[in-house]
Amino acid sequence: MTEQVQLDENKLIAERRGKLDHIRQACKANGHPNDFRRDSLAGDLQAEFGEKTKEELEELNHVVAIAGRVMAKRGPFLLIQEVSGKIQAYAAKEVQKELKDKYQGLDIGDIIGVKGALHKSGKGDLYVNMEEYVLLTKALRPLPEKFHGLTDQEMRYRQRYVDLIVNDDSRHAFIVRSKVVAAIRNFMVDKGFMEVETPMMHVIPGGASARPFVTHHNALDVDMYLRIAPELYLKRLVVGGFERVFEINRNFRNEGLSPRHNPEFTMMEFYMAYADYNDLMDLTEEMLSTVATSVLGSDKMPYGEHTVDFGGKYARMSMLDAIKQYNPDHSEIQALTYEGVKDRDLMVSIAKSVHVEVESFWTCGQLLEEIFGETAEPKLMQPTFITEYPADISPLARRNDDNDFITDRFEFFIGGREVANGFSELNDAQDQDERFKAQVNAKESGDDEAMYYDADYITALEHGLPPTAGQGIGIDRLVMLLTNTHTIRDVILFPSMRPQA
């Protein structure tokens, strides 16, 4: 903000504070009345009366009480906005004079209540005749001049309340988000899943490979960690006999900011006993088609230059096959087998040839995943399940019966990004013990995102976890797809931001 703009804004704020002082003196009150009650919403009025003629409305003489924020003044008309939409209010000359005398006029951003008969203008727009009115809240700060297009991205995220006032697209995105979460919840309950809540603070971080946030519990005098995933607690519940559970809640990962990443984000995780990862893929297809149709009215929708189709069966291919498909001219990749993947020198050579910056502590499985991420992932625009993840990057997933180098795991991609991760759960306590120990060794070798050893979880597995499949779905990324937005900040109400200078 330039110095001149700041001075102009300060002047407007001072003027509006003066108006509020005038209102308090004139009304002998605090200037914020709380006794007006509306009985109608703009959206409902438009739906019910929008098709009626001017003459029909005059004959009806339907009196309504509305309330909302003044977004524009056009001659005698005020454009009032509230949660359901917009509607006009008409101030006759005597009313305009009263408004000036009582309130020193109304400003853009003020919140008012209006009561009067519903009419239609010569242009066919509904309006409420201002027979009774009250200024409910004086806006002391001016809105951006062009209320139809706040374009300062920093302001949009730092002052989301302003963004929601002035940007229809932002309001729509968060309405869709709310409906998506509700639709997923209803779908899961209809499928016999029980919604649960598990701890947000963990003594041992687990359930995913990520760097945690650390906090301290003063009374217990112990360090605790904001959860990176609820997985291990949810599987404890399956051990306890709750055979179908799900949770929609926040996870926290102490990582960087990007168009796809926010340190706190929303996941839906669910676990079902007596199922495998194939059942998860089938359920995911049904869920996403149902959610898209119920929220947006169609299972096909635009995303950038593409049309994403959530209907029908989704593509399924192994990670190795996907790498080959999107590197048709790379002879070493085309000749690659799982035996070759176990050759670290070969994998390092291939990774470098496709411009992957290799870390010294990466395993062969990590190298395969990085090659996939660099060359194949961005090209997966349509819903696709990528399967056969190496065991060394899947410490909680069940090994494949035919090839113990890989697991019965998939990740789900749409629009060139991962949206979900699922697998048949590892329920062999001894194998899990060994994999936890391998993760500890990896952490000691420099991998900050490797998992900790969780002895109590091993104890739970020793009591017996039935054959189980589990999955996590990133709500934020799913909403990005359903709203055709390309940065996660546009679908999180208050995203994490770097401190202002």
Swiss-Prot record:
Keywords: Aminoacyl-tRNA synthetase, ATP-binding, Cytoplasm, Ligase, Magnesium, Metal-binding, Nucleotide-binding, Protein biosynthesis. It is found in: Cytoplasm. Its EC number is 6.1.1.6. Mg(2+) 2 binds at E418. Pfam families: tRNA-synt_2, tRNA_anti-codon. It catalyses: tRNA(Lys) + L-lysine + ATP = L-lysyl-tRNA(Lys) + AMP + diphosphate. Its main location: cytoplasm. It is an enzyme of class 6 (ligase). Its cofactor is Mg(2+). One of its GO terms (molecular function) is magnesium ion binding. Mg(2+) 1 binds at E411, E418. One of its GO terms (cellular component) is cytosol. Binds 3 Mg(2+) ions per subunit. One of its GO terms (biological process) is lysyl-tRNA aminoacylation. InterPro entries: Aa-tRNA-synt_II (IPR004364), aa-tRNA-synth_II (IPR006195), aa-tRNA-synth_II/BPL/LPL (IPR045864), Lys-tRNA-ligase_II (IPR002313), Lys-tRNA-ligase_II_N (IPR044136), Lys-tRNA-synth_II_C (IPR018149), NA-bd_OB-fold (IPR012340), NA-bd_OB_tRNA (IPR004365). It comes from the Bacteria. Homodimer. Belongs to the class-II aminoacyl-tRNA synthetase family. This is Lysine--tRNA ligase. It comes from Aliivibrio fischeri (strain MJ11) (Vibrio fischeri).
